[in-house]
UniProtKB/Swiss-Prot annotation:
GO terms for cellular component: cytosol. Belongs to the RNA methyltransferase TrmD family. S-adenosyl-L-methionine binds at G112, I132, G133, D134, Y135, V136, L137. Homodimer. It comes from Porphyromonas gingivalis (strain ATCC 33277 / DSM 20709 / CIP 103683 / JCM 12257 / NCTC 11834 / 2561). It is found in: Cytoplasm. It holds the Pfam family tRNA_m1G_MT. This is tRNA (guanine-N(1)-)-methyltransferase. It comes from the Bacteria.
Length: 225
């Protein structure tokens, strides 16, 4: 899988996406991740990529020209399944969406910045707008990093244990059940006996019951009638 991220602050996410599991995925050739400095595609003497909005609105707006140039250039190199814009206006990013996007081959993620982007970019260049929550960040870099991490860990071979991703919280719209490791008892705090029993069917039943209970208690909005 290849993900191209367009940003004015590549250094903000470079270290985050070059370490741990995502870094190893790149080293093993399972994920190709490219960060593109949008300012490199500006023809302005000062490499500006924003300007004042028409109509007297406050703030600055990302210009259409440099964004069009870089997306057009990238599309001459390969076909892209989606051109994503990180925006609080977009559809909410969740685990099913991460699953869906992980099955694709090539993605472009455009990081929003300033007051917003020239609306023509949304009309003619963007195929999907995605939000990671109902709040506003300084820019879309953190949102792009969150989405990339969530998507990349689902690529076959990225995690040593594929079952780990399949049992994550939000798969099947349930929170994950409690997990424990050694020692079995610490300061009087015991691991549930069922997990030490070795009875796989009973353990699976317990885990499902715990997942349902935790979801009802902590995220009742996930429970469908």
């Amino acid at each position: 899988m290849r993900i191209d991220i367009i940003t004015v602050l590549p250094e903000m996410i470079e270290n985050t996406l070059n370490c741990s599991i995502i870094g190893r995925a790149q080293e093993r050739g399972l994920l190709e991740l490219k960060l593109h400095q949008l300012r490199d595609y500006s023809t302005d003497k000062w490499k500006r990529v924003d300007d004042y909005p028409f109509g007297g609105e406050p703030g600055m707006v990302m210009q259409v020209e440099p964004i069009d140039r870089i997306i057009t250039e990238l599309k001459t190199q390969r076909e892209y399944d989606e051109v994503i814009f990180t925006s609080p206006d977009g559809e909410r990013f969740d685990q099913p969406m991460a699953n869906e996007l992980s099955l694709l081959s090539n993605l472009i993620i455009l990081c929003g910045h300033y007051k917003g982007i020239d609306y023509r970019i949304r009309e003619h260049l963007i195929t999907r707008e995605i939000s990671i929550g109902d709040y506003v960040l300084t820019g879309g870099e953190l949102a792009a990093a969150v989405m990339t991490d969530a998507i990349a860990r689902l690529i076959p071979g990225v995690l040593n244990d594929a079952g780990s991703a399949l049992s994550d919280t939000f798969q099947d719209n349930l929170l994950a059940p409690p997990v424990y490791t050694r020692p079995a008892e610490y300061k009087g705090w015991r691991v549930p006996d069922i997990l030490l029993s070795g009875h796989e069917a009973n353990i699976a039943k317990w885990r499902l019951e715990q997942a349902v209970e935790r979801t009802k208690r902590l995220r009742p909005d996930l429970i469908k009638d």
